[in-house]
Amino acid sequence: MVYDLERTKGVLWLENFVMLALTGGEGPEDSLASFLTSFIRQGQLRIVSEMSLEQLEVMRRLVPGFVEHFQIISVSEMDTPTSLRIFEYFNQYTNRTININFSQKALELSYVLLDRFVRYESFPGKAIRFLQTCANQAFLANRRHLDVPDVIGYFSQQTGIPDFLLRDDLLIDNESLHRFFLARIKGQNHVIDKICSIIKVFKAGLNDPNKPVATLLFAGPTGVGKTATAKAISEYFFGIGQKYQPLIRLDMSEFQHPGQIYRMIGSQGKLVQHVREKPFSVILLDEIEKAHPLIFDALLTVLDEGMLIDDLGRLADFRNTIIIMTSNLGGTQRSSLGFKSYQGHDFEADIRAFFKPEFYNRIDVFLIFNPLDEITIRAITLKELNEVENRDGIKQRGLKLF
């Protein structure tokens, strides 16, 4: 191959540049990249290829010095008009080859959704992949025309994002929204009002696009429904029993020591991996006060810019996440779990005294959960008993708990 290219003065196009470092012997020194280095240095071989910035770093790490023999040309992402023109060309191609046609509004919506929710890839590549998948699924379903509802359905199916968040209607039934949370959260009406407001702001697209959807801190004694509220928010967006499990729950007591930090925010960390796999998620950081202080410093970037870069330089995008932190500061006595003896306690003062101002000030909403009175506890008990009684194993046996 090298002889033919040198003789004809041809140019070698490599589709997968990283494979040069992975093909050959057991180590990098025996790889195909090392073998070709001398030919490239002497001008006997001319190569053109393409790769992402992440792949470039991998090549530099696997075969030091090899990439430096190439002239690197940075290609920026296409602007909106150019991307839409490529959409139209692709639509003409699918119409000609498999008789699938996208409406103009469907193409424009595809761009908007991909730009907002899919941020690890660039245009037009991510658009072509998405439209190709839509066209293939429509072809298998014997459909020939795709409009806005079809694009929303396929996008929701591929990303796990609820379709009602993707539709353009801005109105949310306020009564049904409150009713949903009232059925799941007892004795915390002020919390429900604030959560409903956050959801309506997000649905209307009025939240800051360069930050997480919302950053919430739930404070109060143990057993008043802080974790249950986070689960209810996740259930509202995604439902129960779905294949896509969007609630990312981390017990912060597992990250108390400096050596444990990378288990959360490193390249193999729980939080980074979950967010990269599920960019639209509800993140629950349980008992945040137990985490090592260095984690608070790392979270500053997440709360302020909606981004986190791991130790390999890879980006984790938090701009479509809801971050919920719970804290028991000031409410750790076990003698009265969530009862009225905590009435009047200044939980906010405890939180302010514990966290640095730069961390506390980046929290969007600080919610103090009320202690539970006897009537509320009775209602919660009946609700839990009803759920147990309705389990399949109990119903099949015809058992009654009360």
What function would you assign to each model-found segment?
Residues 1-402:
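AAA+ P-loop NTPase nucleotide-binding core of proteostasis motors
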